[in-house]
Structure formats: structure tokens, C-alpha cells
Curated annotation (Swiss-Prot):
UniProt biased composition (Low complexity): 50-70, 270-280, 891-905
Listed Basic residues bias regions: 672-682
Source species of the chain: Saccharomyces cerevisiae (strain ATCC 204508 / S288c) (Baker's yeast)
GO BP annotations listed: carbon catabolite activation of transcription; chromatin remodeling; double-strand break repair via homologous recombination; positive regulation of invasive growth in response to glucose limitation; positive regulation of transcription by RNA polymerase II; regulation of transcription by RNA polymerase II
Compositionally biased residues, Pro residues: 71-86, 872-881
Ranges for region Disordered: 50-119, 270-299, 664-698, 847-905
Subcellular compartments: Nucleus
Protein name according to UniProt: SWI/SNF chromatin-remodeling complex subunit SNF5
Lineage: Eukaryota, Fungi, Dikarya, Ascomycota, Saccharomycotina
Amino acid sequence: MNNQPQGTNSVPNSIGNIFSNIGTPSFNMAQIPQQLYQSLTPQQLQMIQQRHQQLLRSRLQQQQQQQQQTSPPPQTHQSPPPPPQQSQPIANQSATSTPPPPPAPHNLHPQIGQVPLAPAPINLPPQIAQLPLATQQQVLNKLRQQAIAKNNPQVVNAITVAQQQVQRQIEQQKGQQTAQTQLEQQRQLLVQQQQQQQLRNQIQRQQQQQFRHHVQIQQQQQKQQQQQQQHQQQQQQQQQQQQQQQQQQQQQQQQQQQQQQQQQQQQQGQIPQSQQVPQVRSMSGQPPTNVQPTIGQLPQLPKLNLPKYQTIQYDPPETKLPYPTYWSDKKADTDTLLYEQIIQRDKINKYSLIRETNGYDPFSIYGFSNKEYISRLWHTLKYYQDLKNTRMKSITSTSQKIPSASIWGNGYSGYGNGITNTTTRVIPQVEVGNRKHYLEDKLKVYKQAMNETSEQLVPIRLEFDQDRDRFFLRDTLLWNKNDKLIKIEDFVDDMLRDYRFEDATREQHIDTICQSIQEQIQEFQGNPYIELNQDRLGGDDLRIRIKLDIVVGQNQLIDQFEWDISNSDNCPEEFAESMCQELELPGEFVTAIAHSIREQVHMYHKSLALLGYNFDGSAIEDDDIRSRMLPTITLDDVYRPAAESKIFTPNLLQISAAELERLDKDKDRDTRRKRRQGRSNRRGMLALSGTSASNTSMNGVHNTVAAGNASSLPPGEILLPDIADIPRTFRTPVPSTLMPGGVDVGPSVESYELRNTTTYKSRPDRPKPVSPPCYIIDHIPGHSLLLSIKLPGKVNTKEEFAAAPNDTSSGTNAMLPSPESLKTKLNSNIRAGVTIPSIPNPIANHTVTNSPNPTLQPVIPGGAASKSVPTPSLPIAPPVAPHDSEATLLTNSNNGSSNNNTQNT
């Protein structure tokens, strides 16, 4: 076969070598030399590309025909066993209709090689033939598994041949796709090269045009500059001529004025000498010109002739600019620049005035103007005034025990909150002293997050009966097996505090609950599809039926749906959250639904792992599990029958207290029945044979059995989960009025009434003041009586008082002791261990000492004799620190009489 186009004999050998592989996948336009490629026109390139595509298509068609012709009929000694009755006539017809193979052609392309022999094609049923090839392969694989399970080798062989045929079709599609992609790539390369060449040509043209345009602009600018210079020179010459003419005219006018003045003076008479001005001669001797008339005159500007204008009643015709920068290249004159400056200044002033009055809209109402600043201050001041008045009113009402609105507003007055429009108070939800403070260690959290590859959520079910376990608790939760931050004991303790268990009961049952959780964690079988680390899209279509029967409070949710246990991308938590959002269910149902799904999926995973299933998409040998697996979905089974629509519809029932009690009793009865039967599955125990025991841990899937259950089983037998028994979920209501379905701790939420009671309590009497044991009284002459306290056993004091009447001094001063006697008293008191303050001479009349039996000696004014009077014992004052104050004990006297001996203590 000649792949070269016609007319190539006239082309040189170099060009013929370039196009020698045209029509093959290895041909590319990039192999054409650059010089030859630039010389070709776009039409020639398009013709080459079309010719290449035609030759390539014809080559592919010939290859396909040769493959079909070279396929020989099936031989007798290698033919498989006869397929079923439906597939036998199809195979016979295809075998008889195939002609004998023609001789293989010798002029094939060397890259094609020998084509493998293919069996006769098999016509698939229309239901399977309508599906895509990948789906056909999966359906045939399922049918083959079922045929293997039913031990039908004929059907297995027929399906195997059909699978090979589908596989060949898939490979042919891939080959066609690769060829098409190569063609598209070549087309794209051609288009890109053409676009690049066009861009290059355009850039060259633009550069040439720009260069020509630039040269023209320079020439025009030079011409304009020359014209402007000539025009300026002409204007300067004209101005000089005009100035000379003006000067000549001024001189002539001045001369005429002088002549007229002289003539007038001659007519009036001779000019007086005082008024005559002598002529000043210049240094050269010539008379100077008259300068006085031109001193106060300004030089006159030349008159400019205004240009003539013409009024046009129509728009001038539009003309095309020679180049875009025609007007901007011209130099603006002074008038234009000044006019633009004035316009710009007025525009800026206008905008500034608008901003000062209205402000900047994007920032606030009035922007950054004075009005905005004042209004903002006014609003802030008003807010603080209102806040102050509200708080002061609330504080005053609270102090007067008058119910008033809270400072913080009305708050929440919805479900479970009651009324908050009362006196401000803070009520914690849980007592602080009853809970432990949990201090989170950020380093542990970081290490846990770094070391954890994935989470293994274990479904935990807690069911404790009052008769058997001496306490009642039902709850379900998910526990992360890989989590090492929280201990099970701490979690159980916090959970029991939520359920308001007493301290003694809580400490008694913590170990029981922790042991139950640990046993369920040990019995947990991980997801084998995740542990095998198989890279797959989707699953093996192992669908089961999930049944939900959840009771939370007085609400019961009943539903069922299909779930693929082989697809590890299915997330029960996301499904539960989406379902509760659609049905508007509270958060208690989210965790309950996720737990129920994981629990039922775990039962199937564990049963298959214990039976030795390889989890590779093969057929399941166990009849009971295989019967519970749902069949493969086909085109006829896409829509669910109308009779099953009621079953696969969620039902949320409102149950009464009596119905809830009945369900609770049924649950207890089922629990006791299962406990009596030992939770045996549908076949009881599974005997481990030599073959099954070796397959229990294949592919790295480790199967774990609880130690407690394994110890009670006979040797060689294991306990399988009962997949027929779907547990019903009961949640113990949490004692809370905030969570829906909880148990009200106090009275009903709707039973609150606002009642105001006022009680008046009398103020208690003020306590009577207690007089101190000792007073310090100032000495008032004529109104007080000085007393001298004598210490027992002191002789010096008696002698001093005995010698007092013999003193020449009279009155009160005569009875005062001398300073020397005071020194002796102080010394004696210091020896006795009593501290006495220093007393000045003119004020101090006596000292106070701590004596068990002091004696009072009255001093009578007027020189009366002194007499010792026994007095009762006085309370002893504590010792005081020394200071410069007066410390005397005085008694008031009535008009100086000696009969009144009243003491004032």
C-alpha cells in the first residue's frame, strides 16, 4: 500500500523523505523544516492535514477488516463444554456463518504485527447489551459468581467467553480513543503553529507601520517647529516696528504740546521769574529732552486685533485623525493651560463642599464631615444617658425589692427558660463544686492529631436492668478506638453525673459500665475494606437492609433503607445528619441513627470475617448471609415497586406513656430471652474445620473474639453475631428541661405564674453602747474631786500624805505630791511591771495604777484633813504604751462638799 499522495515524484528527495510517513500515527507537522513551513500557504497546510487524516482512517479500517478475516473458527479439541440452551444456537450460527480465513497480506505496516486469534462473537441479551461496556463486565462477573455458586460449568464457560469478547471491545475503544486523541493533538499543533505564524506576521506589520508612522510624526514636528520659529520671528519684527512708530508719535505729540504752551505764555505776558524753570544742560552740552510730562505715565500696551469669528448653524463634518496622539502632541498655549487649571480648581472645590455637607457614602451616613462628627457624638451621649438611667432605675428597684426589668434586657423567654424579666441573678446550670475542672493539654492533643491516621468508631450499647444490675440505664454511643486522650473511667463518671446519679451509686456502678465498654471494644471487628487498603471506585454492591427502631422520649422513629457495606466512602454520621435535617428531628436522633447503622454493618463485617470471606468481590458461600444480601440492580429494577414504598418511608410516631411502658416491658422480655438463650445465632456455634480455620485471617484481616465468650465455648467453635435480630434503641431520658424528650426536673414549663409578694420587716433595735472600763476626764477646778490611789505595802506614800496637812500651802495644791514622790512612785511601778505614761507637772494630779484593792482618799478644798475611804475593787485596765497625755482618775463633787463621795468610772 502506497501511503504517499500523488505528485510526489516531482518533489525533491528531501521533501519526499519528510512526507514518507504521512498517514501513520508517527506523522507530525512539527517535523517539516522551518524554511519549507514558512514557504507553504495556509491552504497547502490544510490540504496536507486533510490528506493525512484520510490515509490514517483508511489504514485503521483495513486493520479492523484484517483482524475480522484472520480470526479462525474454534477447534474441536480446544472447544469449551457446551453452554446453556439459550447460548448454544447463537454460538452455532456464528460458527457456521464465519468464512474461511483469507491469506494474511504481506504489505501490512510493520508496527501492526500479528493479530491474535479471537473466538466467535456471542450475542448478549438486550438488557445487558444496552449497558456500557464497564457495566456489562460487572454484570457478567456477578452472573459468573452466581453460576459458580450453583455449580453450573457450562454457563460459567459461556459467560467467560462473553467477558473476553467485552474485554476486546473495551480494548478496541481504547485504541480508537488514543488514535482520536493523537489526531486532535496534531490538529491543535497545526492550529497553534498557524496562529503563531499569523501573530508573527501581524507583529511585523505593526512594527513597520509604527516605524513609518513615527517617521511621519517626526517630519511633521520638524515642519511645525520651523513654521513656529518663522512665525515668532515675524511677530517680533512687527512688534519692534510698532514700538518705533509709537515712540515717534509720542515725541511728535510732546513737541506739539510744548509749542502750544509757549504760545499761550507769550499771549498772556511774560512769565514771572519765580515760576521760570532753568534749563538743565547735559554733560555733553546739548539740551536734554523734556522728561517731566512722561514721569507719571505707564507704557501703553500694543493693541491686539481680535480674530474674526464665524457662526456655523450645523455640526462640522467629522474627519479622521492622522494618528491617535494628534491633539496631545500639540503644545498647549498659556490660555488653555490657565483655563484648565481654573476648571480643575473649581471642580475640586465643588467636591470638597459636597463632602463637607453630605460626607462619604461608603463609610457612614454623613462621611467625615462636621455633621457626621457631631451626630455621632450626640448618638453616643444619648446611648450612655439612656443606659445610665436604665441601670440606676434597675439598681434602685432591686434595692427596694421591687421586681424590675433586668439590665441586660428580656433575655430568652422560650422553651424551658421560664421568665427572665425579674431581678438580675446568675444561676449556673451545674454546681461548680460537683464537677472536676478539665484542663486540656494542648501538647497531647497535638500529638494525638499527628499520630492518628484514621478513626475507628466502635458502636457501644449500654443496657442495664434494675433486677439484674441493681440500676437502670440504657444508652448508645460511638467510641473512637484510636483515641488516647480521654479515659473510659472519666467519661463514665461524667455521663453518670449527667444522669444525676448520687455519689454513692455512681462510685458503685462505674466499674460495671467501664467493663461493658471495654468488652465491646475488644470484640470490635474493624472495617476490612479499609484495612485491606484496596484502591477501588465504589464497592462490590454488597447491599443490606438497615432497619431503624429508635425511641427517644415519647417519639418513635421507624424506617428502613438499603446500605452498601463494601463501600468505605459511606458515612453514617453524614447520612444521619442529613436525614434529621430533612425530618426536622432533634440532635438525639442523629447519634442514635448513626449508632444503629454502624452496629448493623459491624454485625455483617464480623460474620463474613469469621466465615473466612476474602472481601474481594467473590461470591458468599454462607446461605443465610447470601439470602439477606439484596440482588443486583438492573434497568428493570431501578424503580422500587409501589407496594414497598410504605415500608421504605420514615414514620415518626407520638406514643403515649402507656405505650411507652408496654414497649419498655417488651424490651425487657426480649433481653431476658436472649440472656437465657446465650445470644446464640441462627445456627448456634460454628465449627472451625481445617479449611475454614486457615481462612479466618487471610489478607491481613485479624478477627478478634471476646475473651469471656471464647472461654465458655467448646474447642473448635466460635460465636457468630445474630444478624436476624435487629436491636431496638431506647434512650434513657436525660433529666433536663432544655433538651427535647428530657425529664422535667421541677414543675412543668407552662406552669409558671408571676406573683408579687411584699413583706415588711421591722428594723432591729440598735445595740446599747458598752462603756469602757476606764475613762480619761479633764480636771475642772470646783467641779471635780481628785482621788489619790495608794498602793498597799508602800510606806512612803502614807508618810507623804501624813505630812501634807503640815504644809504651808493651802487648797488643792497643798495636797499635791512633790515631784520627788512621783519619781519614787514611778520607780516602784516600774519594778512591779506596770507601765505608766509620763505626766507633766502643771497638769498631772495623780497616776493610775493596777492595784487589786485600791483605796480612795478624798481631798477637801479649804485645808480639810484627808481621810482614807475604802472602795470596792475596780476593773483593771490593760497596760497602755507610754505617751505625753494626761491619765488621771477623777470624781465629780457637788459644790465642793465633802459628804458627796460619788465615783464616776
